[in-house]
């Protein structure tokens, strides 16, 4: 993992960070590539109501998302999508920040999954994204499949990875298994 330490404020694709922010090479590459792409990085459908991607970084990408009938965007990144990218597009934006390369806490994970379930049950198509659309996004999607379809953690992880190769980091994989056990325990006692 290559990191660059910013010595000044940096702005790429509508997102800015202050001095001292560590910029990974992956972040830089996604941002630069995203500036010229009309489709968000790593975009794909998970089912007929839920899509996933890396962070949308320009207005054209938000127009693309809206053109697909997506009505809600759930951002898992530390920063929400800037208002100027979505203004007037009829998109509902939700922000459930999660730290990159870590397993989210139960409250954040269940909030994101609850949003997906609530929005899709009301007929709204949803986009879930993090920076690259793999770690945090894959983790939330697997948790959604565990709750929605009653899959085991391993089945959900396998399903997400079959649809979105490279998804879910090892620490998140272990965390999903532990979370699924806690969820099952709450269901039994509850």
Q: Which residues does each PLM region occupy?
A:
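Cys-dependent protein tyrosine phosphatase-like superfamily
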Residues: 1-127, 142-190
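Short cysteine clusters
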Residues: 130
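Conserved G/P- and acidic residue-centered "switch" motifs that form tight phosphate/ATP-binding loops
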Residues: 133
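Ser/Thr-glycine-rich phosphate-binding loops at phosphate-binding pockets of nucleotides
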Residues: 137
């Amino acid at each position: 993992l290559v990191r660059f330490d910013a010595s000044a404020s940096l702005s790429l694709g509508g997102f800015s960070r202050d001095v001292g922010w560590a910029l990974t090479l992956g972040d830089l590459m996604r941002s630069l590539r995203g500036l010229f792409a009309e489709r968000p990085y790593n975009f794909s459908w998970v089912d007929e109501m839920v899509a996933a991607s890396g962070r949308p970084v320009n207005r054209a990408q938000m127009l693309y998302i809206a053109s697909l009938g997506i009505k809600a965007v759930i951002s898992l990144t530390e920063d929400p999508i800037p208002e100027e990218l979505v203004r007037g597009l009829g998109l509902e934006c939700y922000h459930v920040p999660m730290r990159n390369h870590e397993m989210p806490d139960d409250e954040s994970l269940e909030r994101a999954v609850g949003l997906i379930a609530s929005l899709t049950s009301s007929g709204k198509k949803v986009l879930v994204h993090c920076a690259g659309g793999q770690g945090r996004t894959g983790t939330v999607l697997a948790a959604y499949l565990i709750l929605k379809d009653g899959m085991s953690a391993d089945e959900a992880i396998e399903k997400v990875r079959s649809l979105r190769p490279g998804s879910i980091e090892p620490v998140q994989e272990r965390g999903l298994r532990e979370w699924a056990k806690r969820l099952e325990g709450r269901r039994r006692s509850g």
